Swiss-Prot record:
It comes from Mycobacterium leprae (strain TN). It holds the Pfam family Ldh_1_C. Catalyzes the reversible oxidation of malate to oxaloacetate. Its EC number is 1.1.1.37. Keywords: NAD, Oxidoreductase, Tricarboxylic acid cycle. It catalyses: (S)-malate + NAD(+) = oxaloacetate + NADH + H(+). The active site is at residue 188. Signal peptide: none annotated. GO terms for biological process: malate metabolic process; tricarboxylic acid cycle. NAD(+) binds at residues 12-18, 106, 113, 130-132. This is Malate dehydrogenase.
Length: 329
């Protein structure tokens, strides 16, 4: 008897990240080759025609694991019974838009989606937010889903985590598989703090292997933090395939667990650990087991790291205050 299909919702499914994501999901990249997937795809009404074309392509791939596809514009229907919701769709910042305008536009989207998930999602729902500003969008969705445990919401900082590993591998001539215990702290924004001081390369402290504090401060941290802007500058469009890949990485490790002796970066609701204000959705080093995450405890934070973490969490606190003033949480 074949296992019950995992019902996976994807919002913004006709967008660039969605287009890169859906075929990976359907081919088994999330849970392997023995767990069928049922896709529930949400889009705004004007994009449903394009989404129909994407579904035609999914059909034409004849994926062995794809148990079904449903599409629609009503989150209360699309989210019905879903086990995993990947909230990819978000309003991009347009010309003349201030930060408050962006938060307000996305607030309406994630308020509605949070309420719909609260009403109709499966009891074991996990919610991953990729659409930016991801941390605060996740906070809005979480606040509007009071019956879903807060620990079931996470925002994507795995892309930053992966970018940091890639930069460190290039610098040291290492394989990405040699690098463990990378950490992204704070917001998925230019204030994020990629922390090499607890990372390891081949079992050795990464900062010591690099042996170049100036490179860490002046090149590594800004390169990781501003990588998205560099990609837009180079290709004329935002990172889509890498964001989709990181979305799958994050969901897979959340559901299946992190490897022994390693951790990953997830933006999750703070319990006050490491001085991050309680209730903020901030990135931490976490381990995962059976769909539950635990913040890694006991890491030493020096003055340099403390300043970086505090700067990013202050930005998150400002965003929380802004959406509170807008009545979104």
């Amino acid at each position: 008897m074949s296992p019950r299909p995992l019902k996976v919702a994807v919002t913004g499914a006709a967008g660039q990240i969605g287009y890169s994501l859906l075929f990976r999901l359907a081919s088994g990249s999330l849970l392997g080759l023995d767990r069928p997937i049922e896709l529930r795809l949400l889009e705004i009404e004007p994009a449903l025609k394009a989404l129909e074309g994407v579904v035609m392509e999914l059909d034409d791939c004849a994926f062995l694991l794809l148990a079904g596809v449903e599409i629609g514009a009503d989150p209360n229907k699309v989210f019905d019974g879903v086990n995993l919701a990947l909230l990819v769709g978000a309003r991009p910042r347009g010309p003349g838009m201030e930060r408050g305008d962006l938060l307000e536009a996305n607030g309406a989207i994630f308020t509605a989606q949070g309420k719909a998930l609260n009403a109709v999602a499966a009891a074991d729902i996990r919610v991953g937010v990729t659409g930016n500003p991801a941390n605060t969008n996740a906070l809005i969705a979480m606040t509007n889903a009071p019956d879903i445990p807060r620990e079931r919401f996470s925002a994507l900082t795995r892309l930053d985590h992966n970018r940091a590993i890639a930069q460190l591998a290039t610098k040291t001539g290492s394989a990405v598989t040699d690098i463990r215990k990378m950490t992204i702290w704070g917001n998925h924004s230019a204030t994020q703090y990629p922390d090499v001081f607890h990372a390891e390369i081949g079992g050795k402290n990464a900062a010591e292997v690099v042996g170049d504090q100036a490179w860490i401060e002046d090149y590594f941290i800004p390169t990781v933090a501003k990588r998205g802007a560099a990609i837009i500058d180079a290709r004329g469009a935002s990172s889509a395939a890498s964001a989709a890949s990181a979305t799958i990485d994050a969901a897979r490790d959340w559901l299946l667990g992190t490897p022994e002796g390693n951790w990953v970066s997830m933006a999750v609701v703070s319990d006050g650990s490491y001085g991050v204000p309680e209730g903020l959705i901030s990135s931490f080093p976490v381990t995962t087991t059976d769909g539950d995450w635990t913040i890694v405890r006991g890491l030493g934070i020096d003055d340099f790291s403390r300043g970086r973490i505090d700067k990013s969490t202050a930005e998150l606190a400002d965003e929380r205050m802004a959406v509170k003033q807008l009545g979104l949480i």
